Amino acid sequence: EMCIRDRPRFGLGADILMGFPGETEAHVLETLEVVRSLPLTYAHVFPYSARPGTVAAELPDQVGKAVRQERAARVRAGVEAKREAFWKDTLTCERLLVALDCNEDAGSASGQHGVDECYVPCRLRTPLRGEGHTLIPVRPVSVSRKGVIVEPVRP
C-alpha cells in the first residue's frame, strides 16, 4: 500500500507456484484474490512438479498434473488481465523514459524497443538513428499485444 501511495504507477512481478501438494480449490481462490488485489504486471506462473528425493515429492495429497496445469492457467489469465490494464493505463502518462536496448536499422520491421521505468515493454513507432542503449523521453500512443507503442518527445 505504501508503494502504491508513494508511486501511483507501480508494477510488481512475482513467481507463483501452483499445485503444490495439499493445495485445495480454496487456496487457488485465495491466490486469485491476491493477484486481483496486487499491482501485478508480470508473473512467472508455473505448475508444481515433483522432484525425486525431495520432501515435497513424498507429501500426501499430491495434486494431479492436469489440475496443476489448469490452476496455473487460471492464475496466468488473472495476471494477464492485470498486465493489459496496466499497459492501457500507461496511455494516460504524458511522458515516459524508455531505456532502449537495441539500435536496429531504421528500416527494421520490429523497430527499436526497450522498457519504461516500470518495465513495460515499449517500441518506438518510428526508429531513431544513433539512439541505442540510452534513455529516451517518449509519449505513449497505443498498446499492442507486445507492449506500448511510443514516439520520441523532443525538448
Question: Model-predicted segments: where are they?
Answer:
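Terminal RNA-binding accessory module
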Residues: E58-P155
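Catalytic cores of alpha/beta
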Residues: F20-S37
